Amino acid sequence: MNKTLLDILVCPVTKASLTLSKDGTELISKVGGMAYPVRDGIPVLLETEARTLTADERLDSGSAK
């Protein structure tokens, strides 16, 4: 994902910054505890499409997955 785009995008719920997952398939909101899917290179920033991070993922200093 383009770094400039990643710098602009925020969590739609908390307005906190997002981090790209290690495998590039999700955008992670550590503050909100949510992971938003990236489908065909397009972030899907809908709360209804997000999943809740597991306790282990929340503790991970990197990203989910």
Curated annotation (Swiss-Prot):
Listed GO CC annotations: cytosol
Transmembrane segments: none
Gene3D superfamilies to which the protein is assigned, alphabetical: 2.20.25.10
InterPro entries linked: Trm112-like
A Pfam family recorded for this sequence: Trm112p
PANTHER family (UniProt xref): PROTEIN PREY, MITOCHONDRIAL (PTHR33505:SF4), ZGC:162634 (PTHR33505)
Family under the similarity heading: Belongs to the UPF0434 family.
Name of the protein: UPF0434 protein Mmwyl1_2153
UniProt source species: Marinomonas sp. (strain MWYL1)
